[in-house]
């Protein structure tokens, strides 16, 4: 549950007979994070931290408790807009969260189930998690804090330029899955528009027989296909560009190195990344493959959507930043190795280097947008 001591700060925002606020919520694999902000000034906010929840019932209990604590602190509080980021396809304002385990009915959430005092009718919005992250990129740009959190990769091949392109920007992130969203700016629209996608589910484009990494890649792809598809179908990028994908890659390279087949339940993706950064060979090869295919996915997405910039974002990118920089030349080779090389010359790639919760920024941004929407 969230601390009432942090909530006390909202009392400072009261101006008249009521205290209008906005609420942004990011639901992750282990729970949720919430930001409360002043409706009149989004620069005034309080981040309540993390609360555990891995079932719908647990999430609702946390939010109902939060609603009670807010009213206990200031009974005149009214929420004018709310946005909540979730992992999974959203249909008819309902989502089955894909980063929680268990039966579907225990991880199904509808917007009508949320406490009305925090999520007002017609002023509340579900966001796909990467959609929220993309709106967070927009929010960070508008607050002039975007550039300081990223480094441009491959500067010997691409021109310098803004992270948030004047036209189209692809925002990608690896976590429990592989998310991708498109940010587009056009004179026809007052504000940038985010298009959520499911492009992480594109099937992998394999290299052909004379490529120097053909044999190794084919064996890895086959290993992943054997696990998920009975060895018949080409895996999707998310099958390797995700936490579960890193587990499978490590299982493959560990067996190749030692002959031992480790059960997946004994492999922790976070530990693999740490071992890779420390230079352990099987983990290094696994994390390298994880990122090679990530850049291949980024290449497919950026070229297909005619993007000027490509943003590799969120916490795992920051944690793995030293490794990314260590293999940057290999990643550059992968990204620019394309059947239409002239298409790649103007695409800029950026990697997040410091922690900034773009999902919370994005949900707060959209909460204020919906709160200020004309009736």
Curated annotation (Swiss-Prot):
Single GO MF annotation: ATP binding
Pfam family, one: Glucokinase
Alphabetized UniProt keyword annotations: ATP-binding, Glycolysis, Kinase, Nucleotide-binding, Transferase
Recorded catalytic activity of this chain's protein: D-glucose + ATP = D-glucose 6-phosphate + ADP + H(+)
Record note on quaternary structure: Monomer.
Similarity annotation: Belongs to the bacterial glucokinase family.
Record's protein name: Glucokinase 1
